[in-house]
Curated annotation (Swiss-Prot):
<feature type="binding site" description="in other chain">
    <location>
        <begin position="13"/>
        <end position="16"/>
    </location>
    <ligand>
        <name>IMP</name>
    </ligand>
</feature>
<feature type="binding site">
    <location>
        <begin position="12"/>
        <end position="18"/>
    </location>
    <ligand>
        <name>GTP</name>
    </ligand>
</feature>
<comment type="similarity">
    <text>Belongs to the adenylosuccinate synthetase family.</text>
</comment>
<dbReference type="GO" id="GO:0004019">
    <property type="term" value="F:adenylosuccinate synthase activity"/>
</dbReference>
<protein>
    <recommendedName>
        <fullName>Adenylosuccinate synthetase</fullName>
        <ecNumber>6.3.4.4</ecNumber>
    </recommendedName>
</protein>
<dbReference type="GO" id="GO:0005525">
    <property type="term" value="F:GTP binding"/>
</dbReference>
<comment type="function">
    <text>Plays an important role in the de novo pathway of purine nucleotide biosynthesis. Catalyzes the first committed step in the biosynthesis of AMP from IMP.</text>
</comment>
<feature type="active site" description="Proton acceptor">
    <location>
        <position position="13"/>
    </location>
</feature>
<feature type="binding site">
    <location>
        <position position="42"/>
    </location>
    <ligand>
        <name>Mg(2+)</name>
    </ligand>
</feature>
<keyword id="KW-0342">GTP-binding</keyword>
<keyword id="KW-0460">Magnesium</keyword>
<dbReference type="InterPro" id="IPR018220">
    <property type="entry name" value="Adenylosuccin_syn_GTP-bd"/>
</dbReference>
<dbReference type="Pfam" id="PF00709">
    <property type="entry name" value="Adenylsucc_synt"/>
</dbReference>
<dbReference type="InterPro" id="IPR042109">
    <property type="entry name" value="Adenylosuccinate_synth_dom1"/>
</dbReference>
<feature type="binding site" description="in other chain">
    <location>
        <position position="194"/>
    </location>
    <ligand>
        <name>IMP</name>
    </ligand>
</feature>
<feature type="active site" description="Proton donor">
    <location>
        <position position="43"/>
    </location>
</feature>
<feature type="binding site" description="in other chain">
    <location>
        <begin position="40"/>
        <end position="43"/>
    </location>
    <ligand>
        <name>IMP</name>
    </ligand>
</feature>
Length: 337
């Protein structure tokens, strides 16, 4: 029995979707539970060459044997949830979906307010998905809950009960975090942050799991960090430099171009300390050095690639156990014992 939490180590867009999908296939958890803010964070999962952009359904959906759960702490947009369930019909997502009846519900008014608020949309760079305004209503105790919405009633249940019973039965459980630690309302670059905490302890609380039940915390870092929206970015490079390196990306939810920077070891160390990370996953090593593309054995990495991994381990103080060398699940180096 292992309960693992996957967290983003930067400003989101670290490639958590790929790492989560890999862990779900390799470790075969019986439940994949999603924590985090809500549909403001997008994950891209590639299965057999086909890409799926999702915001509500857990990214471990390719594991067709696992139950998929959305915790009570996660804001839910019924429209987005139902569209994704339909889009992923061939993975039998609808039959495996469990949404906590206590989850907060995003309504159209929340999205309208998010988009029309100049401070949120222009100064902060909100995604406009209604999460901030919905969390305001939640704090005021006026927000609707999942149990109040007829259109998603068939998916309602007690996620905390299901997850804890799975752990008691000796099953593996994976908890998905969203966004990134540096976007935390408490520990990020305030006010350029999201509307709640985005660290491991909060993700555990989102799905109703106590801290003593957590065995592993995997912090995911991209070889070159990216950020969408406003806010400090200490190692940011120019657009021209990013283009010369072939690093041009756009946000899954917003479609906005991502800002690009160099790996920041000090920030990574801070994030690992904050989350109690037990291991690190590095993604896009093939973008840092194209010679690493598709490599599946550590010994076969280029010297440049190995040096990057070694420097991360030495300066951050946490073992790198997973290395992504391409978009496909099989393009992964796994050095876990």
């Amino acid at each position: 029995m292992t309960c693992t939490i996957v967290v983003g180590g930067q400003w989101g867009d670290e490639g958590k979707g790929k790492i989560i999908s890999y862990l779900c296939k390799k470790d075969n958890p019986s439940i994949i539970a999603r924590g985090g803010v809500g549909p403001n964070a997008g994950h891209t999962v590639e299965v057999d060459g086909e890409k799926y952009g999702i915001r509500m359904v857990p990214t471990g959906f390719p594991n067709v044997n696992a139950k998929l759960a959305v915790g009570a702490g996660v804001l839910t947009d019924p429209e987005v949830l139902l569209k994704e369930i339909q889009m992923l019909e061939k993975f039998n997502v609808g039959e495996r979906m469990l949404v906590d009846y206590r989850c907060g519900i995003i309504e159209e008014t929340h999205k309208e307010l998010d988009k029309s608020n100049e401070h949120l949309s222009k100064e902060i760079g909100s995604t406009g998905t209604g999460c901030g305004p919905a969390n305001v209503d939640r704090a005021m105790r006026t927000l609707k809950q999942g149990k109040d919405i007829e259109s998603i009633s068939k998916y309602m249940g007690d996620v905390s009960k299901a997850v804890n019973e799975a752990l008691e039965a000796g099953d593996n459980v994976l908890i998905e975090g969203t966004q990134g630690s540096l976007l935390s309302l408490f520990y990020g670059s305030y006010p350029y942050v999201t509307s709640k905490d985005t660290n491991a302890a909060s993700f555990a609380a989102d799905v109703g799991v106590g801290p003593t039940k957590i065995d592993e915390v995997v912090a995911v870092f991209k070889s070159y960090p990216t950020r969408v929206g406003e806010g400090p970015f200490p190692t940011e490079m120019s657009v021209e430099e990013a283009e010369s390196l072939g690093v041009v990306e756009y946000g899954t939810v917003t479609g906005r171009r991502r800002r690009v920077g160099y790996f920041d070891h000090e920030l990574a160390k801070k994030v690992c300390r904050l989350n109690g990370a037990t291991q690190i996953a590095i993604t896009c090593l093939d973008k840092y050095d194209t010679e690493c593309y598709g490599i599946t054995e550590y010994e076969k990495l280029s010297e440049k690639g190995k040096a990057f991994i070694k420097e991360v381990e030495e300066k951050v103080g946490v073992k790198v156990t997973l290395i992504s060398t391409g978009p496909e699940l099989g393009q992964t180096i796994d050095v876990r014992k």
